[in-house]
């Protein structure tokens, strides 16, 4: 049975990301999600390479470990709902991903290149040129990725897939995607202390003017954005 609250939260996050053009914060990757079973030329990948694909409204990153294996930090709501590894190891759908972002649950897991890419085109080591940082040796990059496998808390701003790969590749956790998302949101929300006030005002507007009020969406979105931006 579907949970209406999780369904609504998933839809809200998706709309927020669309509004902020989050997908445009990194390079546009053509062909995203056009065919989950498409073949990939994995012989061109080297252990320790950073792989980059377009996934839902995010640019998703992973570290190639060799032998058709990719380590990547992946939000997944199922991690909060079950300990059944057979279920959680299945390919993470876009809805599972979005709900995992909302609930801040994730793991650093290993998938095949095909499952990681989810039908999108793959860019290799594109961050090297974007960030203009000196990368570590590829074997060290892969070793760092392997050492971090397992459950991890998720934060859109402080611990996402880009933070994971930049730590492995360059030795420091940075995420231009997250920084640009934060810059967009803070134009509207300047102080986290406004969360309680906005929630109270939003509740009052809903009570007195009804759910159809034009004030309802901001009343819900502002506290929700603050929740997602918290560590």
Curated annotation (Swiss-Prot):
Inhibited by all-trans-retinyl alpha-bromoacetate and N-boc-L-biocytinyl-11-aminoundecane chloro-methyl ketone (BACMK). It is an enzyme of class 2 (transferase). Residues 1-194 are cytoplasmic. PROSITE patterns: LRAT (PS51934). The chain crosses the membrane at residues 195-215. Keywords: Acyltransferase, Cytoplasm, Endoplasmic reticulum, Endosome, Lipid metabolism, Membrane, Sensory transduction, Transferase, Transmembrane, Transmembrane helix, Vision. Hepatic stellate cells and endothelial cells (at protein level). Disruption phenotype: Knockout mice are viable. Knockout mice at one month of age show loss of nearly all cone photoreceptors in the central and ventral retina. Surviving cone cells show severe degeneration, the dorsal retinal also exhibits a significant reduction in cone photoreceptors. At one month of age rod photoreceptors show shorter outer segments. Nearly all cone photoreceptors are lost by six months of age. Remaining cone cells show disrupted structures with the majority showing abnormal cell bodies or lack of an outer segment. Its EC number is 2.3.1.135. Pfam families: LRAT. The keyword Acyltransferase applies. Residues 50-177 form the LRAT domain. It catalyses: all-trans-retinol--[retinol-binding protein] + a 1,2-diacyl-sn-glycero-3-phosphocholine = apo--[retinol-binding protein] + an all-trans-retinyl ester + a 2-acyl-sn-glycero-3-phosphocholine; 1,2-diheptanoyl-sn-glycero-3-phosphocholine + all-trans-retinol--[retinol-binding protein] = all-trans-retinyl heptanoate + 2-heptanoyl-sn-glycero-3-phosphocholine + apo--[retinol-binding protein]; 1,2-dioctanoyl-sn-glycero-3-phosphocholine + all-trans-retinol--[retinol-binding protein] = 2-octanoyl-sn-glycero-3-phosphocholine + all-trans-retinyl octanoate + apo--[retinol-binding protein]; all-trans-retinol--[retinol-binding protein] + 1,2-dihexadecanoyl-sn-glycero-3-phosphocholine = apo--[retinol-binding protein] + all-trans-retinyl hexadecanoate + 2-hexadecanoyl-sn-glycero-3-phosphocholine. Induction: LRAT activity is up-regulated by dietary vitamin A. Under conditions of vitamin A depletion, LRAT expression in the liver is induced by retinoic acid. Pathway: Cofactor metabolism; retinol metabolism. Transfers the acyl group from the sn-1 position of phosphatidylcholine to all-trans retinol, producing all-trans retinyl esters. Retinyl esters are storage forms of vitamin A. LRAT plays a critical role in vision. It provides the all-trans retinyl ester substrates for the isomerohydrolase which processes the esters into 11-cis-retinol in the retinal pigment epithelium; due to a membrane-associated alcohol dehydrogenase, 11 cis-retinol is oxidized and converted into 11-cis-retinaldehyde which is the chromophore for rhodopsin and the cone photopigments. PANTHER family: LECITHIN RETINOL ACYLTRANSFERASE (PTHR46678:SF1). This is Lecithin retinol acyltransferase.
């Amino acid at each position: 049975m579907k949970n209406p609250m999780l369904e609504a939260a998933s839809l809200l996050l998706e709309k927020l990301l669309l509004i902020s053009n989050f997908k445009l914060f990194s390079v546009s990757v053509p062909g995203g999600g056009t065919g989950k079973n498409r073949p990939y030329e994995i012989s061109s990948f080297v252990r320790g390479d950073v792989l980059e694909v377009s996934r839902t409204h995010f640019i998703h990153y992973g570290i190639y470990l060799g032998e058709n294996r990719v380590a990547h930090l992946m939000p997944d709501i199922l991690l909060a709902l079950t300990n059944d590894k057979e279920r959680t190891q299945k390919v993470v759908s876009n809805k599972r991903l979005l709900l995992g972002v909302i609930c801040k649950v994730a793991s650093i897991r290993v998938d095949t290149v095909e499952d990681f890419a989810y039908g999108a085109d793959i860019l290799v080591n594109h961050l090297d040129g974007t960030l203009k940082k000196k990368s570590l040796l590829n074997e060290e990059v892969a070793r760092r990725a392997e050492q971090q496998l397992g459950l991890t808390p998720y934060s859109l701003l402080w611990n996402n897939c880009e933070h994971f790969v930049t730590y492995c590749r360059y030795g420091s956790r940075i995420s231009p995607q997250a920084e640009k998302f934060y810059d967009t949101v803070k134009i509207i929300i300047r102080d986290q202390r406004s969360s309680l006030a906005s929630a109270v005002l939003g509740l009052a507007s809903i009570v007195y003017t009804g759910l159809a009020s034009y004030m309802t969406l901001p009343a819900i979105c502002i506290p929700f954005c603050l929740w997602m931006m918290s560590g």
